Swiss-Prot record:
SUPFAM superfamilies: L30e-like. It holds the Pfam family Ribosomal_L7Ae. Disulfide bonds: none annotated. This is Large ribosomal subunit protein eL30.
Length: 104
């Protein structure tokens, strides 16, 4: 994969559709409307466990971002913390391929 996660995330935010936030992402994850999930390293463990459990049932890839929620928020161009990003439509990005490649 030639581009970094940050580059793919910026392409995703520009051309795709995402949901920011744990509650909204969990809700869509339970209904199978999310294609992938990005989780920051600072997300509470109980919430991270919930996301991992639901994603395994639906075979939805998860990327564990090594930075904090504040760093992920900054990457998203937000002035606040973003702990979870739900990918609804990847647009022109290849972020789902990137996530699957990293998992292998």
């Amino acid at each position: 994969m030639s581009q970094s996660f940050e580059g793919e995330l910026k392409t995703l935010l520009r051309s795709g559709k995402v949901i920011l936030g744990t509650r909204k992402t969990l809700k869509l994850l339970k209904t199978g409307k999310v294609k992938g999930v990005v989780v920051s390293s600072t997300l509470r463990q109980d919430l991270k466990d919930d996301i991992m459990t639901f994603s395994k049932f639906s075979d939805i890839p998860i990327y564990l971002y090594k930075g904090s929620g504040y760093e992920l928020g900054t990457l998203c161009g937000k002035p606040f913390m973003v702990s979870v990003i739900g990918i609804v439509d990847e647009g022109e990005s290849k972020i789902l391929e990137f996530i699957k490649e990293v998992k292998q």
